[in-house]
Curated annotation (Swiss-Prot):
CDD domains: F1-ATPase_delta
Membrane topology category: Peripheral membrane protein
Keywords of the record: ATP synthesis, Cell inner membrane, Cell membrane, CF(1), Hydrogen ion transport, Ion transport, Membrane, Transport
Protein name: ATP synthase epsilon chain 2
Entry's localization field: Cell inner membrane
Function as written in the Swiss-Prot or TrEMBL entry: Produces ATP from ADP in the presence of a proton gradient across the membrane.
The organism of origin for this protein: Burkholderia orbicola (strain AU 1054)
NCBIfam families to which the protein is assigned, alphabetical: ATP_synt_epsi
Family recorded in the similarity comment: Belongs to the ATPase epsilon chain family.
Top-level taxonomic group: Bacteria
Length: 152
């Protein structure tokens, strides 16, 4: 019994994988689909998500990020046509760029945020002092017969 299947993954941009795989997991519209050799024929849309496959010759797990598409399973193999896709190294590079960008943004805002936090703390302290003064003044002006709990 054959333990691998022909798998082709293509996108508008490029052919991403063409070879034999032990299995592939794709994000189907109704949930994750695990496809093994000799799977029943199937034609379905896929939703955005991660495609995971195990390369038959090497046993290496590979991951791709897809932005939707179509999956066809036939006797001849599996074909995934993705609207758009990224290989894991491209995805890692994208994440690295995004992390650097976020860190740069944070550094640029850091001094400003601290200044705002300090201003907020000062404003709160001033407000609390004004509230304390208000209650102190209100208590001084209150006549002895106006005290809460006294019968009038």
């Amino acid at each position: 019994m054959k333990t691998s299947m022909k798998l082709d993954i293509v996108s508008v941009e490029a052919a991403l994988y063409a070879g034999d795989a032990h299995f592939v997991v794709v994000p189907g519209e109704s949930g994750e689909l695990g496809i093994y050799p000799h799977h029943a024929p199937l034609l379905t849309r896929i939703r955005p998500g991660v495609v995971t496959l195990v390369d038959a010759p090497t046993g290496e797990h590979r991951r791709l990020l897809v932005a939707g598409g179509v999956l066809e399973v036939s006797r001849d193999g599996v074909t995934l046509i993705a609207d758009h896709a990224l290989r894991t190294p491209e995805l890692d590079e994208l994440r690295t760029r995004e992390a650097r960008h976020a860190a740069d943004d944070w550094r640029q805002r850091y001094a400003h945020e601290n200044r705002r936090a300090f201003d907020f703390a000062s404003a709160r302290a001033e407000l609390m002092e004004e509230i304390r003064r208000f209650f102190a003044m209100a208590l001084r002006q209150q006549a002895p017969h106006d005290k809460p709990g006294s019968a009038g």
